């Protein structure tokens, strides 16, 4: 009941999410398995066959809810926001932490990187809500080169583990 505006271009009306263009015309979002519940976004993870709660920034941050931001770009942004002052080793550890959550056998964590990063109730990564991640998503990195190097290295280590059983060290 009522309208809850989440961002200048997104609103939830009676549990249905709409996107508004610059002229104010509303379009019902389709193909997305999510609903707005208070300050959280309830998302259905088809792989885990389970619902998870995301922070409202899931809809507010451009390219996240619709999946337009690639896993690599999101992971690099998280690495820089969480551990930008810790060099490649620290950033790679952050990336591996996110990636490891995607294969949690107990399904306490979602199966997609964007879902893990934005998971709420409780908040998994404070950089989602404190503005640090959004800053990186807008291109303002502290150490872009090392963030991408760490994200790529972690993705390779993780892929080798999942596909070949190679240790994640």
Specify the residue positions occupied by each region the protein language model found.
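Extracellular adhesion/carbohydrate-binding repeat motifs centered on closely spaced tryptophans
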Residues: 1-63
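Bacterial extracytoplasmic/cell-wall-associated proteins, especially those involved in peptidoglycan
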Residues: 65-169
């Amino acid at each position: 009941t009522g309208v809850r505006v989440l961002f200048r271009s997104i609103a939830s009306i009676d549990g249905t999410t709409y996107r508004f263009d610059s002229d104010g015309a509303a379009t019902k979002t389709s193909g997305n398995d999510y609903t707005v519940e208070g300050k959280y976004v309830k998302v259905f993870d088809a792989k885990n066959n389970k619902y998870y709660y995301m922070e409202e920034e899931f809809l507010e941050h451009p390219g996240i809810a619709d999946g337009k931001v690639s896993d690599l770009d999101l992971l690099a942004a998280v690495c820089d926001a969480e551990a930008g002052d810790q060099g490649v080793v620290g950033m790679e550890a952050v990336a591996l932490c996110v990636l490891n959550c995607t294969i949690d056998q107990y399904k306490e964590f979602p199966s997609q990187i964007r879902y893990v990063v934005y998971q709420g109730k409780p908040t998994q990564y404070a950089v989602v809500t404190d503005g640090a991640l959004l800053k990186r998503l807008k291109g303002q990195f502290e150490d872009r080169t090392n963030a991408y190097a760490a994200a790529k290295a972690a993705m390779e280590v993780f892929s080798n583990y999942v596909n070949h059983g190679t240790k994640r060290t």
